Amino acid sequence: MSSNTVNQRVNFASTKNPLEYPDFLEVQLKSFQDFLQLDTPPEKRKNEGLYKVFAENFPIADTRNNFVLEFLDYYIDPPRYTIDDCIERGLTYSVPLKAKLKLYCTDPDHEDFDTVIQDVFLGPIPYMTDKATFVINGAERVVVSQLHRSPGVFFGQSVHANGTKLYSARIIPFKGSWIEFATDINNVMYAYIDRKKKLPVTTLLRAIGFENDKDILEIFNLAEDVKVNKTNLKRVLGRKLAARVLKTWIEDFVDEDTGEVVSIERNEVIIDRETVLEEVHIDEILESGVQNILLHKDEPNQSDFSIIYNTLQKDPSNSEKEAVLYIYRQLRNADPADDASAREVINNLFFSEKRYDLGDVGRYRINKKLNLTTDMDVRVLTKEDIIEIIKYLIELINSKADVDDIDHLSNRRVRTVGEQLSNQFAVGLARMSRTIRERMNVRDNEVFTPIDLINAKTISSVINSFFGTNALSQFMDQTNPLAEITHKRRMSALGPGGLSRERAGFEVRDVHYTHYGRLCPIETPEGPNIGLISSLCVFAKINELGFIETPYRKVENGKVDLSDNGLVYLTAEEEEEKIIAQGNAPLNDDGTFVRNKVKSRQDADFPVVEPSEVDLMDVSPQQIASIAASLIPFLEHDDANRALMGSNMMRQAVPLLRSEAPIVGTGIERQLVRDSRTQITAEGDGVVDFVDATTIRILYDRTEDEEFVSFEPALKEYRIPKFRKTNQNMTIDLRPICDKGQRVKKGDILTEGYSTEKGELALGKNLLVAYMPWKGYNYEDAIVLNERVVREDLLTSVHVEEYSLEVRETKRGMEELTSDIPNVSEEATKDLDENGIVRIGARIEPGDIMIGKITPKGESDPSPEEKLLRAIFGDKAGDVKDASLKASPSLKGVVIDKKLFSRVIKNRSSKLADKALLPKIDDEFESKVADLKRILVKKLMTLTEGKVSQGVKDYLGAEVIAKGSKFSASDFDSLDFTSIQLSNWTSDDHTNGMVRDLVMNFIKKYKELDAELKRKKFAITIGDELPAGIIQMAKVYIAKKRKIGVGDKMAGRHGNKGIVSRVVRQEDMPFLADGTPVDIVLNPLGVPSRMNIGQIFEAVLGRAGKTLGVKFATPIFDGATMDDLDQWTDKAGLPRYCKTYLCDGGTGEQFDQAATVGVTYMLKLGHMVEDKMHARSIGPYSLITQQPLGGKAQFGGQRFGEMEVWALEGFGAAHILQEILTIKSDDVVGRSKAYEAIVKGEPMPQPGIPESLNVLLHELRGLGLSINLE
């Protein structure tokens, strides 16, 4: 684009960063795309997102397996309304989700039942806009990604009160029961199922198939089997028994209920385990008839496994059957019906795919942790997993392994939007499949179709409650583009399934070494959420398992691979133990290190090593920070706490009337604007065909193939938003920065405004600042402003507020919008139109009527006589009351827009007119579709000319164009393209691809026409779509122009915030030697203790830039040095460090000391005094205490609290104090008497009893105490 639309910047980066920034919204957009997989043909869809949810819930069969409902495919239709329509009308921007379902019968008795394939509507699903937001009930919302504990196995330790270390292993699945293995102070290992049921771990091992002690001990290679005979027994005297010696026999008894003979196996313990074998035992063993006995092995690591022996001692069971029974009783507190049902319960706990799911992540983590090679498809626990976990736990006890660090990012993963939606869908579909099954069972004998089985409300109610009430679905912060993009890249540890503020300790909130390049160590809120909400780093990505990855360059033999192949994205786990060089380590052209020692990072350590030892290198010094922190120039010179405030306050910067990009930037500003999607950008290469204040049209370049398969014109029109309101009542008002005939490339930014200038982020203004005290007015961070800033509207912003009023039908009758309001003067309604809505351009003052509405009064129903009289004389005033919308006490502004939406209220004639109109609309649609199909058939004929069909099939697999036949126009005319398989029509791959694209574009265009038809019909028959129960809705938009004034909050980018304390006349401000007055005076004492020296660097470089007309980019940790500053100040002819002697504006004399005078980028923040200032004389009172309410929203009073009372007592001001505590507060009688006295000019009456005393008396009487005032 031309240089007049792009800011050229001098870049100080020493590392010319070859790695492009990733798309900053990829986190959200890619996740949602993977959830729907709309661009992928059904047969190639991955088993994730929505497809996976369908695959897991279908096929659904009835209880007798007679009918089966199978899932074939899903698709979506275009949305009915545009995003803007939805925002205006308070609707949800959603698309209809439809599924192709197949219902068939397997029962031979139902021969008459044909297989049915139907497209079934499953409800609307909110659709993500290209800005990665959702429009829910007219408001833009963002679904924040959640950081939670990854499924898998975790090893931890705790310390018992007596000082013993207790170890535990916990297996966390995606779905199913938690199981924990833990040791106790007696060195016994227990398994806890779902955190409550406790059983010895050996009981669990028996139940899963290691039936006897021998099997259990052999797992750990602890026992030796000895065959029982006298010789062998004599040889092993003195050794310990590893397992009990059991005598087994069968006992028969008669079951009294059935009369059957039942056999039962009985066990008797002859010798207990851990007994040392002596002579006396030999005969006992021989008599018991045991074939083998088990002895401990004499091995050095024997003692390591003492916990297994101790656990066997505690084990109440001796066989699998007993173990299964024991576990069943623990879980259910009852006896099982039979052995099989008990086994099934245990099997369902961990080994059933329906009930238990580790997920890909859980399996991956368990394999990685325990060095297993189990297949990734095995999503349930295996016996091997349980054994390996027990073995690892034993290693922990013996200090041969380490416990896991729960805050390590390999143990935390991200749930993105797509996954959260999948989980909600799974809940909705599970509910729906239950109702489908029930309906199938009920309708056994009748003929039914998939549509009869499905209730679309089930899914949409779950999805709606997720978007409406879930803690992670948030009202988007839309103060400026940075606030939007940061909100979408936020990672929250809160929310369902996450932590809670109260329980989160310091460790979870702390910065961890694995956050490097993944989560920003700087940007997090101050207050109770600190450390629980973080922001994704600039280069970070989230992989398919949900772990955060960051890029590095490979280093081999001391040489950095600077090619694209040398780039690797690593998770925290893959980065373990690696030695990583800094991003700004100096390199030679061939990629070798300049210095023979390299500063590097290895986990939490920072060794200085030889180049040959380095494994990886950072891609950029900015890798460590998030977008907001990367926007702070000279961040490396600021204290982290102030940088945190700086990055948080940039999100609160109000878009100004005229935006101005910073002189000193960091080079990331352009990418941020492009990726925020708040401006109009070119979708491809092309030429600007037309441009004015409201419209841009671009003619895009297209290849022949693209032109051929498309049904859209190459000319695309964009509407430029004007004075559009954001969620935070800021203004989006864009203007074009391209010219007619100009060539544009893909990604070029075509507009500016809403905190952007020439395609760069522009949150504030470059102001001339002096660091010096000024008459005490800038004490404690206060700011002194030059009046010029106010006069020239440098820091003026426009805020748009929307006010709406709804018309409903009440029990008493219909409400009505009108300018004819009872008991209101003509003066008050002079600006209202016939619908009672204020005219555009009217100035609004507090108390003015903005929308006039009357509503039927409800004292009593009128009698028939009254009704008759009213009908004759038309007396309406008596039965309605004024329900108009009036301006609140602080509202002043200008009406810039108004809208009225209404449902159609039908009378007979209008119904007839509609009847005539609807067929015309249908005919118009039919002819458009016929034209469209004609073009399609013509193009298909061109494509398939001379080619032979390879067999074109429909969804049922039936051939509709036979294999080997030639394609003909009549064949194509008769095809239903919506139910055709699009793969391999011909033997040529290129033609097949073109056919596929052509037919897909045809279907897309057809669906758009269909949606338009539905929209038109809806508009005629029903009118505007409005939320339920509302007949009309009027909206008024009021713009307020806010100049900066005393009490407004301002800040720089380094956490240097303050309140404007005085606006000083231009001639009274300190001025430079050439007579230029400074714009703003800041207190120099705000710098040293805050340690944000970056602001001084910025001021010095900014002034050099302003003098020379140059803009700079100084990337963080790689920016301008002191030498660079000196060089540029010398070039600009400024003193070193811009230490300048100023003159006093009042006297004209020069000050004694030089002060730093520079140009700093200052922001005006959203905390404006006009929104906060509030005063009241009389107003509402609390119902019970009769004291004035509190807060501006309630038009409340100021609390005169305990300490204020002490102050008046200290002065002895008894009368004032009495007045404040009685008639000015809650003495109800006194209030009215005082009013009377003021009106009549009489002296003030004596105050009465405050209401709060009466409340106290009532409370005491409520306790049964008889209390009276004498």
Swiss-Prot record:
Transmembrane segments: none annotated. One of its GO terms (molecular function) is ribonucleoside binding. GO terms for biological process: DNA-templated transcription. It catalyses: RNA(n) + a ribonucleoside 5'-triphosphate = RNA(n+1) + diphosphate. Pfam families: RNA_pol_Rpb2_1, RNA_pol_Rpb2_2, RNA_pol_Rpb2_3, RNA_pol_Rpb2_45, RNA_pol_Rpb2_6, RNA_pol_Rpb2_7. InterPro entries: DNA-dir_RNA_pol_bsu_ext_1_sf (IPR042107), DNA-dir_RNA_pol_bsu_external_1 (IPR019462), DNA-dir_RNA_pol_su2 (IPR015712), DNA-dir_RNAP_su2_dom (IPR007120), DNA-dir_RNAP_su2_hyb_sf (IPR037033), RNA_pol_bsu_bac (IPR010243), RNA_pol_bsu_CS (IPR007121), RNA_pol_bsu_protrusion (IPR007644). The keyword NADP does not apply. GO terms for cellular component: DNA-directed RNA polymerase complex. It comes from the Bacteria. Keywords: DNA-directed RNA polymerase, Nucleotidyltransferase, Transcription, Transferase. Its EC number is 2.7.7.6. PROSITE patterns: RNA_POL_BETA. The RNAP catalytic core consists of 2 alpha, 1 beta, 1 beta' and 1 omega subunit. When a sigma factor is associated with the core the holoenzyme is formed, which can initiate transcription. DNA-dependent RNA polymerase catalyzes the transcription of DNA into RNA using the four ribonucleoside triphosphates as substrates. Belongs to the RNA polymerase beta chain family. This is DNA-directed RNA polymerase subunit beta.
